[in-house]
Amino acid sequence: ALTEQASKVALTADL
């Protein structure tokens, strides 16, 4: 769950 969320946040914050 943590890895999934971290990946999502990384993509969302990918500037």
UniProtKB/Swiss-Prot annotation:
Keyword annotations from UniProtKB, A to Z: ATP-binding, Calvin cycle, Chloroplast, Kinase, Nucleotide-binding, Plastid, Transferase
Molecular function GO terms recorded: ATP binding; phosphoglycerate kinase activity
Main location class: plastid
CC annotations in GO: chloroplast
Lineage top rank: taxon: Eukaryota
Pathway membership, UniProt: Carbohydrate biosynthesis; Calvin cycle
Cofactor: Mg(2+)
Chloroplast recorded as keyword: yes
Subcellular location as annotated: Plastid, Chloroplast
Swiss-Prot/TrEMBL GO biological process terms: reductive pentose-phosphate cycle
Catalysed reactions listed for this entry: (2R)-3-phosphoglycerate + ATP = (2R)-3-phospho-glyceroyl phosphate + ADP
KW Kinase (keyword) present: yes
EC number: 2.7.2.3
Description of how the protein assembles with itself and partners: Monomer.
Homology family: Belongs to the phosphoglycerate kinase family.
Entry protein name: Phosphoglycerate kinase, chloroplastic
Source organism of this protein record: Physcomitrium patens (Spreading-leaved earth moss)
